[in-house]
UniProtKB/Swiss-Prot annotation:
Coiled coil: none annotated. GO terms for molecular function: poly(ADP-ribose) glycohydrolase activity. PANTHER family: ADP-RIBOSE 1''-PHOSPHATE PHOSPHATASE (PTHR11106:SF121), GANGLIOSIDE INDUCED DIFFERENTIATION ASSOCIATED PROTEIN 2-RELATED (PTHR11106). Its EC number is 3.2.1.-. It catalyses: 4-O-(ADP-D-ribosyl)-L-aspartyl-[protein] + H2O = L-aspartyl-[protein] + ADP-D-ribose + H(+). It comes from Streptococcus pyogenes serotype M18 (strain MGAS8232). Keywords: Glycosidase, Hydrolase, Metal-binding, Zinc. Its cofactor is Zn(2+). SMART domains: A1pp (SM00506). The keyword RNA-binding does not apply. This is Protein-ADP-ribose hydrolase. Belongs to the MacroD-type family. Zn-Macro subfamily.
Length: 270
């Protein structure tokens, strides 16, 4: 069985041969981390076009190795809160073995094309595998227009431990600008649409990232308040959804502190 180092070399060779990302046509690195970065940069920039079976077989083997390199996080590993159906997980959302994770997508719904970018959209698409971009392209082709803010779409999670990914596009906030009622409602719609879709798909566990708080600039405090209030209100309006366990995933210490505070019943964002 080829090593991850060798698999990366073969994948890079195939991607460079395509010449779809010729700006990254450079010698094959000798260091593992450099190969990882080059492969990720190439696949990040690659258009949503069919891939060869040879490439997909290599990618499957490489991502299977990646998947075996960590212990997935289940609901029972998550932090309990004062609400029986709400949990917290501080860490990498890619490691969650739940029915679905929520991806903060953009209006193209094809993932992030910036090489090695640090956004959640890039991380999820890279390690779910390139089939995810193709699946999203099929959705967008059928839809025939950009994805609207506050909607939600469901795909397989492919190589991630989760079974599915729910993609939603949140509102943008210019730095220093006040959060208008319209944008607050658009963010709330992201949560409602994702919850509605999860129930429609028969899911029993759903992990939310902090939608719009990264590249889209939504203030973290207001975003956390909206997220929790929206989920609690949705639960009250959908008593039949008691079987749906909801996890709030935090990645920064600031987000964790906010959710820790607001998920105490005496501080429930009212």
């Amino acid at each position: 069985m080829p090593s991850s180092f060798d698999l990366l070399g073969e994948m890079i060779g195939l991607l460079q041969t395509e010449q779809l990302t010729s700006s990254l046509a450079c010698p094959l690195p000798n260091a593992l981390t450099k190969r990882q970065d080059l492969w990720r940069a190439l696949i990040n920039q690659r258009p949503a076009l069919p891939l060869s079976k040879d490439y997909l077989n290599l990618e499957d083997a490489y991502l299977d190795d990646w998947r075996a390199s960590f212990v997935p996080v289940s609901v029972k590993d998550c932090q309990k809160t004062n609400y029986t159906s709400l949990f917290l997980y501080h860490g990498d959302i890619r490691y969650l073995a739940v029915d679905a994770i929520v991806n903060a997508a953009n209006s193209e719904l094809l993932g992030c094309f910036i090489p090695n970018h640090g956004c959640i959209d890039n991380a999820i698409h890279t390690f779910a595998g390139s089939r995810l971009r193709l699946a999203c392209q099929a959705i967008m082709t059928e839809q025939g227009r950009k994805e609207a803010i506050g909607q939600a779409k469901l795909t397989s999670a492919y190589h991630l431990p989760a079974s599915y990914i729910i993609h939603t596009v949140g509102p943008r906030i210019t730095k220093g600008r006040h959060v208008s009622p319209i944008r607050a409602d658009l963010l709330a719609r992201c949560y409602r649409s994702s919850l509605d879709l999860a129930v429609k798909a028969g899911l029993t566990s759903l992990a939310f990232c902090s939608i719009s708080t990264g590249e889209f600039g939504f203030p973290k405090k207001e975003a956390a308040q909206i997220a929790i209030k929206t989920v609690l209100k949705w639960q009250a309006e959908h008593p039949e959804s008691k079987t749906l366990t909801i996890i709030f995933n935090t990645f920064t210490s600031e987000d964790k502190a906010l959710y820790d505070t607001y998920l105490q019943k005496e501080n429930n964002c009212e």
